[in-house]
Amino acid sequence: MFGFNFEEMLLGIPGLIIAMTFHEYAHARAAVSLGDFTPRLMGRLTLDPRAHIDPIGLIMLFLVRFGWAKPVMVNPSNFRQPKRDDILVSVAGPAMNLLLGFIAFYIILFIRTHNVDVSSITYGIIQMIFVYNVNFAIFNMLPIPPLDGSH
């Protein structure tokens, strides 16, 4: 049921770190640009994965296919238009994942259509970046608290 594939795990680590880091960074960047400086004050306005990755959540993703990152804390009362801005901050993470997924997809497409010589490891990592980002975007838009789609 919970198959464990060591090769998939190794190829997936960069994809998961990229997906989680950019997802949470997008929330932080959106919040700050909309007037809430809480993420900046908490050190979350960075692409340093250590600010965004919860080690236990990352391990759980591999072991049971369900995990988490450190959520970006925001204070909606700091927003200019709290209801609208809260939604925009929530959508920023999945939107970033979709963008990264499309970029990875087009890199894969370019490699395949132009017969670019890349190692199987590099190709596998790019594939996992695509898979994890698209899955994160879809999953996070489910209307279930605390996911982004519940806002």
Regions inferred by a protein language model and the residue ranges of each:
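Hydrophobic transmembrane alpha-helices and their immediate loop junctions
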Residues: 1-151
